[in-house]
Structure formats: C-alpha cells, structure tokens
C-alpha cells in the first residue's frame, strides 16, 4: 500500500490473540484457504488475464514452465509474481497478482498472503497450488478480526486503536 508511508496508521496488524495459536480472525471462512489449478485450467486463466500485461502473440500462450513468488513484503505477502514461459517471462506487481491468478472470471484470488507450489511434467507446469491466509489487502481493519475481538470482550475503542495505531477518536456531532 503506497499510502502506508504517508499514513503510518495504515499497516498490517497481527490478529494473534496472544496465546495458544488462536487468532481473532480464525472465524473467517477464508482464514486459511487453498486454490489448485491443473495445467489446462491455469492456461485458461492466464489466457484470460495476461493480455493486460504482455502480448500473447499469434500463437497464443506459450508453454508455462514455472510460476513463482519472486518477491515478498516484510509481512510475507506476495510483492511480485513471476510467470516463466519457454521464451521469456512476465513479472506481475503485487497490486495485480490477485487479478491475474483469478480462480474464476468474477472472483479474484482471496489475498496476496499465499505460498505457491508448482508441479511440473516434461518441463511444463502441470499443477499449481496456492495455500493462503485471509482475504483482502492486509492493511487496516480486519473485519473478521474485529468481530472476534468484540466477541472476546473488546470494545470499539480498543478494536479501532489496535487496527489504527496512533489515531484518536473524536466526536464530530
């Protein structure tokens, strides 16, 4: 998030409850998730999403030889995705990763907090698995975490000060 530098309260905040491996946001249906694509499905997704980033040429999409996370942020989110073809590669910036690895045409990937495992057959990616956590961009208030914190007895002041450190609440009316 480019604005995080200008606004120090916009940053990733841990939702760990402080003990026993429990997280306030673990009630989310997307707390831990997994997407899996076979080679044919991956090819169909990239044929649909990659033209915005690279020309496919008259022959269509080349053989996909690797898909990898090439850079991560300090919090472990994907900062750049690299897709390797027989003759070249394309690098997808963090802001576009969820749209390029779109599981369905109308649904982006849940978040950039994921790890990839590529299985190859004959030098070509035959299966790609993304194992991830959460949903969204990872900055600001986690909606599910706020619900979990409220259920644990935290009031709105404490919840907001946790997600937006250094801010103050003021009555405007």
Feature annotation, model-predicted:
Residues 1-173:
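Conserved, single-site charged/polar hotspot
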